[in-house]
Amino acid sequence: MQITSGLPEGFNAGAYDMIVVGAGYAGAVCARRLAETIGYRVAVLERRSHIAGNAYDCTDEAGILIHEYGPHIYHTFNERVHNFLSRFTKWTDYQHKVLANINGTLMPVPFNHASLKLAFGDERGEELYQKLVETFGKDVKVPIMELRKKNDPDLAEVADYVYENVFLHYTMKQWGQTPDQIDPSITGRVPVFVGDDDRYFPQAPFQGMPQEGYTALFEHMLDHDLIDVFCDVDARDLFEIDETTVKIDGKVYGGEIVYTGPLDELFNLDLGALPYRTLDMKFETLDMDQFQPVGTVNYTTSEDYTRITEFKNMTGQILPGKTTIMKEYSKAYTPGSGETPYYAILEPENRELYERYLECVQNLTNFHPVGRLAEYRYYDMDAVTNSALDLSDEIIACHA
């Protein structure tokens, strides 16, 4: 693998069997699979100055490993995904825990046995917990919609508390919505965990952090003799698309194209911009060993920011006397501003607009949109990895 800033003079896309746009999970997984499985020569074009997409991590001035685009916590139920990624990293045994700051009191989320006693007091909290156990059993996640369906005043009390203090104000900040705009089906999925496990992903069999960090994972994944990586390259400057062909640098390209960027930007927003939420991230390095007891604290009833992440709590890095935290402020995304589009706003009219963009490439048999931006959806890291593995299998099958 070579990683180069910019394209070399005389770059010839035709010398490659596949062009991958984007060096995040979707792009890197496809590049590796096609290179090692059927011997494709692959060029990866990355708009940013680094690989690893939003999972990119780096060391800050204090020597602390930070996640530049917000916290990324690896967890999966998918053994195929875990086995594939484990080829490129060893994992720590980090088990992610999240606390909600509810009116100054830190409570575990998802809401659990301990949370109930903190919220309602020991005696009342225990009564409510026993009612949950009797109704649903132990060690299960129960959406608050299910609590309300039971028409039980005790269960409704729990549902109302969780809705108001864990979900409502946090969601209003995260999505910029008023309560009447929040989809009731989303509200109803907010869970209560009937048990004592205070991990955020209590049932995921595979979880942890890459021992050397995410960027190192991607370096290992892309380290193949048939893969070349070109950073600081915007594919929009190279691509010309009509109904049946893609031209790169003015020449029709006949190889496979895996595209992981935003479809609307590829077409210069001709049909309109796809709406997203973005984040302002404020990093602060503090002269202390530890700022908070867990990796993430959500501010569900107060503050303008949605959450604070403390990276040392997640990475296990030992660096006495210094710690770096990050506060997240959610806001609407402005196309062309240099902001990062993080969360697709999955309203029906936005999905319809995306489908119209998708129609623009439906006759391009060698053009494969995959990933969070190209598919206009929310993906956890394991899910996008699985999607890229599936796409790779499809391409391999077509050329077997």
Describe the residue ranges of each PLM region.
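Active-site/ligand-binding neighborhood in enzyme catalytic cores
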Residues: 103-107, 113-253
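N-terminal Rossmann-like FAD-binding beta1-loop-alpha1 element of flavoenzymes
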Residues: 16-44
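Glycine-rich FAD pyrophosphate-binding loop
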Residues: 35-61
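Dinucleotide-binding Rossmann-like beta1-alpha1 core, especially the glycine-rich loop
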Residues: 62-135
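A short, basic/flexible loop-to-alpha-helix module at the beginning of a structural domain
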Residues: 1-14
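Mid-domain catalytic core of redox enzymes
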Residues: 37, 237-360
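Short catalytic/ligand-binding loop motif for oxyanion handling, primarily in non-cytosolic enzymes
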Residues: 52-54, 102-103, 108-110, 175, ...
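C-terminal catalytic lobe of FAD-dependent flavoproteins
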Residues: 340-400
